[in-house]
């Protein structure tokens, strides 16, 4: 699997189409940035800088990215959840909530840089909207999934992989604004998850869409997910316009 570097594409999502074809004006416009394959530290530093320097007039943004292999450990995370210290995958300590997780090729990572006060959103409501967007995205591929109380993320609803985690979520709120976000596993090498207790849960199975016999294209899933996120954030049923696709292969 590979991702060719592409320029950052900024797509203001100001007007979308309703199911009936009539224009719908979202409550708060959002800019979608498709950042391609990018080192985790680059994204981390950029989202912190964006949040630290934003003002009341700064627009909200959603960043879509794919990272090279990396473990990230939340600010209250226990390093003991990294079970194999010499795996060859770097570990980065970060300031989001949650424990340890893995990012790698074939996984969609979405960062939500939102002014919650302007959107009149409580953190719990934001988490629910994000989880709903993931559930709706998976449903578009005939995959049933659920949330679990007290365990942010999305889990397989039934079948041989019932209870397995397919999407992770972790946020940081600073001065009323969010950053970090979510990851959704499409088609990836899942072996690095065996070297950790995913999100701090020993023995938690982690799967991707391919494990569930869905041969989904990374770009298509990413576009669906971004559309559902924007629709849920703005309380509309309309899907967002599709930004330019990343040069991406699921091979």
Swiss-Prot record:
Specify the pathway. Protein modification; protein lipoylation via endogenous pathway; protein N(6)-(lipoyl)lysine from octanoyl-[acyl-carrier-protein]: step 1/2
* CDD domains according to UniProt: LipB (cd16444)
In which broad location class does this protein mainly occur, judging by the first location in its UniProt entry?
cytoplasm
Matching entries from Pfam families are given as:
LplA-B_cat
Q: What's its EC?
A: 2.3.1.181
- The BPL/LPL catalytic domain is annotated at 56-237
Active-site positions on this chain: 199
* GO MF term set: lipoyl(octanoyl) transferase activity
UniProt-annotated location(s): Cytoplasm
**UniProt cross-references to NCBIfam families, sorted A to Z:** lipB, PRK14342.1, PRK14343.1
What more the UniProt record tells us is:
In the reaction, the free carboxyl group of octanoic acid is attached via an amide linkage to the epsilon-amino group of a specific lysine residue of lipoyl domains of lipoate-dependent enzymes.
- The protein in question is named Octanoyltransferase
Species of the source:
Burkholderia ambifaria (strain MC40-6)
Q: Which gene encodes it?
A: lipB
């Amino acid at each position: 699997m590979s991702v060719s570097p592409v320029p950052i594409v900024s797509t203001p999502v100001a007007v979308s189409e309703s199911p009936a074809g009539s224009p719908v004006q979202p409550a708060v416009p959002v800019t979608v940035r498709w950042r391609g394959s990018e080192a985790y530290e680059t994204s981390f530093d950029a989202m912190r800088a964006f949040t630290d320097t934003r003002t009341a007039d700064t627009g909200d943004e959603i960043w879509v990215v794919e990272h090279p292999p990396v473990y990230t450990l939340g600010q209250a995370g226990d390093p003991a959840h990294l079970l194999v210290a010499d795996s060859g995958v770097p570990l980065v300590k970060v300031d989001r909530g949650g424990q340890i997780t893995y990012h790698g090729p074939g996984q969609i990572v979405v960062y939500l840089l939102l002014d919650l006060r302007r959107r009149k959103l409580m953190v719990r409501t934001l988490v629910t909207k994000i989880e709903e967007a993931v559930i709706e995205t998976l449903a578009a591929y005939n995959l049933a999934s659920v949330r679990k109380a007290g365990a942010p993320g999305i889990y397989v609803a039934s079948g041989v992989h019932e209870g397995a985690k397919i999407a992770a979520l972790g946020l940081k709120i600073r001065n009323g604004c969010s950053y970090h976000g979510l990851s959704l596993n499409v088609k990836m090498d899942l072996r690095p998850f065996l070297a950790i207790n995913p999100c701090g849960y020993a023995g938690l199975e982690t799967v991707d869409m391919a494990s569930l016999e869905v041969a989904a294209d990374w770009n298509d899933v990413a576009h669906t997910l971004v559309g559902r996120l924007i629709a849920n954030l703005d309380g509309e049923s309309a899907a967002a316009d599709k930004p330019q696709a990343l040069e991406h292969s699921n091979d």
